[in-house]
């Protein structure tokens, strides 16, 4: 069992039709047919959306995505139309709501990996491959790959796992031309972002993109290069052969699997609320990632 510990009731706004509640975002459609995407402060771990929120998290995700969209504008068009608050929207949406183009979304999570860790490491340890791509012997947790690789995954519903799939399977699902365009765009955007992050003392280990079509044009959508969609590591502490310190929700994962939480991940019981010190530490990591990458003060 997994999903929401406490599923939220979406806010109703005149002129907006609520379409979907995701792990973090609420999705609406306005009267012009555009989408309104609102990033909440919800946080998920181990396929559960937790009952405790992380203050400012949704704003950090939104503002960091906007910053990255600017850095990548010459490489990939994006879906953002406006950052203005829709009429009648609550003040709390300020800084976390985006008006976006309605796209024909491609049903593939486009993952780029420059370093080996996570599910890629688990697959490599068994087969010496990731998503069907052969990799050299001798790689360990945190190893830099000879070149970035495209390792797509299926898009799962809330509470379900994304599943890694081969490039050939993606080509069967969406067509050879679209698969090739996804791979090219994913690796180009990752490579640009990796270099920008490296200049700021951050290793971009891997990241996940979503794309959709606006007519015949492939457009970058959803969030980009945030601590929710990426693994960011401090470059000065990168050391292959161990789990890397990171700018993300690792504090949450570590506490949930500790004796202190009293939660058995293998049980079907929902996880407990987070203690304040874990909330504060997690918020600080998200803000630190924003400040290091953008060079701007959050407060």
Swiss-Prot record:
Entry-linked Gene3D superfamilies: ATP-grasp fold, B domain (3.30.470.20), Phosphorylase Kinase, domain 1 (3.30.200.20)
The entry's keywords: ATP-binding, Ligase, Nucleotide-binding, Purine biosynthesis
Known catalytic reactions: 5-amino-1-(5-phospho-D-ribosyl)imidazole-4-carboxylate + L-aspartate + ATP = (2S)-2-[5-amino-1-(5-phospho-beta-D-ribosyl)imidazole-4-carboxamido]succinate + ADP + phosphate + 2 H(+)
Protein name: Phosphoribosylaminoimidazole-succinocarboxamide synthase
GO biological process: 'de novo' IMP biosynthetic process
Enzyme class: ligase
One Pfam family matching this protein: SAICAR_synt
Listed pathway(s): Purine metabolism; IMP biosynthesis via de novo pathway; 5-amino-1-(5-phospho-D-ribosyl)imidazole-4-carboxamide from 5-amino-1-(5-phospho-D-ribosyl)imidazole-4-carboxylate: step 1/2
GO molecular function, one term: phosphoribosylaminoimidazolesuccinocarboxamide synthase activity
Family: Belongs to the SAICAR synthetase family.
Domain of life: Bacteria
HAMAP family listed in its UniProt record: SAICAR_synth (MF_00137)
Gene that produces this protein: purC
EC number: 6.3.2.6
Record flagged with keyword Iron: no
């Amino acid at each position: 069992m997994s999903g929401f510990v406490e599923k939220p009731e979406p806010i109703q706004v005149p002129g907006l039709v609520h379409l979907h509640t995701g792990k973090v975002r609420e999705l609406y459609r306005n009267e012009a047919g555009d989408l309104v995407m609102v990033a909440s402060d919800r946080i998920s771990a181990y396929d559960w959306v937790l009952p405790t929120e992380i203050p400012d998290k949704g704003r950090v995700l939104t503002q960091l995505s906007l910053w990255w969209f600017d850095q990548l504008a010459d490489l990939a068009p994006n879906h953002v139309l406006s950052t203005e608050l829709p009429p009648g929207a609550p003040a709390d949406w300020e800084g976390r709501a985006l008006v976006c183009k309605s796209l024909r979304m491609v049903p593939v999570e486009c993952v780029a990996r420059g370093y080996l860790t996570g599910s890629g490491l688990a697959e490599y340890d068994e087969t010496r491959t990731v998503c069907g791509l052969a990799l050299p012997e001798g790689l360990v947790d945190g190893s830099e790959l000879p070149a970035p690789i495209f390792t797509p995954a299926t898009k799962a519903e809330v509470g379900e796992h994304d599943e890694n799939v081969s490039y050939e399977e993606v080509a069967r699902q969406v067509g050879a031309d679209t698969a090739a365009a996804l791979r090219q765009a994913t690796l180009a955007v990752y490579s640009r972002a990796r270099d920008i992050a490296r200049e700021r003392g951050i290793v971009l280990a891997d990241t996940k993109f979503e794309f959709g079509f606006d007519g015949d044009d492939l457009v970058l959508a959803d969030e980009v290069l945030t601590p929710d969609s990426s693994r960011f590591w401090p470059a000065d502490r990168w050391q292959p052969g161990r789990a890397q310190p990171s700018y993300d929700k690792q504090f949450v994962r570590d506490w949930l699997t500790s004796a202190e939480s009293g939660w058995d991940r293998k049980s079907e019981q929902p996880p407990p609320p987070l203690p304040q010190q874990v909330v504060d530490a997690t918020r600080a990591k998200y803000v630190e990632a924003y400040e290091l990458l953008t060079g701007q003060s959050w407060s």
